[in-house]
Amino acid sequence: MLRISSSSSMALKFSQILFIVLWLSLFFLLLHHLYSLNFRRLYSLNAVEPSLLKQHYRSYRLVSRKVLSDRFDFTPFHSRDNSRHNHRSGEQYDGDEIDPRYGVEKRRVPSGPNPLHH
């Protein structure tokens, strides 16, 4: 008969226990995740009998940004932005504008992509 020493059998038992505990924790985590997904789906599709849980879920449901923006009137903000910007064309600029802060002639700054960056 083959005898296994007590230290090796104890190590074998510890590894088996650790293996079982890890697999059980993974199984319960997966079970919890699937249960919560199915639970939400059942209560969101159930329109026959509203329950307290369904009302609670409905009150905390997230609303998309598009729906919020459809309900809100942004015209005051748009008109203020348009009145603040003073767009000039190239023909209107005569080059004689004096900067009130420094008392010198204002220079035009070219806009567009930075030529130093590729």
From Swiss-Prot:
Q: Where is the composition biased (Basic and acidic residues)?
A: 75-91, 98-108
Q: Which GO terms describe its biological process?
A: cell-cell signaling involved in cell fate commitment
A GO MF label: receptor serine/threonine kinase binding
UniProt entry keywords in alphabetical sequence:
Developmental protein, Differentiation, Glycoprotein, Hydroxylation, Secreted, Signal
Location of the region described as Disordered in the Swiss-Prot/TrEMBL record: 75-118
Q: Which domain of life is it from?
A: Eukaryota
A Gene Ontology cellular-component term? apoplast
Q: Which residues form the signal peptide?
A: 1-35
- Family annotation (InterPro entries): CLE9-13
Q: Hydroxyproline: which positions carry it?
A: P110, P113
Q: Which residues are glycosylated?
A: P113
The record's annotation in PANTHER family points to: CLAVATA3/ESR (CLE)-RELATED PROTEIN 10, CLAVATA3_ESR (CLE)-RELATED PROTEIN 12
**In which family does this protein belong, per the annotation?**
Belongs to the CLV3/ESR signal peptide family.
Q: What is this protein called?
A: CLAVATA3/ESR (CLE)-related protein 12
**Organism, scientific name:** Arabidopsis thaliana
